[in-house]
Amino acid sequence: MSMNPAALIPPADSIPVHWAWLEGFLLLTFGFHLLFMNSVVGSAVIATVRAVTRPQDPAPTLLGKALPSLLALTINFGVAPLLFAQVLYGGFLYTSSVIMAVYWLGLIFVLIAAYYLLYGFSGSRRKKKNGTVFIAAACALLLFTGFVLVNNVTLMLSPDRWVGYFEKQDGSMLNLGD
């Protein structure tokens, strides 16, 4: 007998205002988060490429000074849309987060490491060292963060894949099918 994936969908919670208010705030705050996120990832990639191809170029040094602050702003501006999504789609977001809990909770440590690596890159550039390893590793961690976040959202949107949890109950399931 196969399980009906629709049976796994939790009932909707009541919300204190009309959903359109929360949806509007979600879209507004997520837009700000996207602006900062694109600035961080784009600047980190540019700094990595320039540090490798033109080590004496001042652009990576200037970007290195700004990147830690940009990452902090990106994280702060990412909290509000996450909270609005939790209110609007709580049952789905919570379930997908539990299914991939190892990666979801690991994001805290990944972002802390990326933050320190960005500071390491900035410090190495001030000391007239290249620091390519720092920025390349930070780029990899930032891209991994994006992968995990997108994976969580696609898993949230695919309740039919939640039954895979019963085969792999250690919280390390990823939605690699999309």
Where in the sequence are the language-model features?
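Hydrophobic alpha-helical transmembrane segments
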Residues: 35-45, 110-113
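Membrane-interface interhelical loops and short amphipathic "cap" helices
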Residues: 1-30, 58-59, 81-102, 155-178
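Hydrophobic alpha-helical membrane-insertion segments
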Residues: 69-77, 136-155
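Alpha-helical transmembrane segments and their helix-start/interface "positive-inside/aromatic belt" motifs
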Residues: 27, 58-69, 125-144
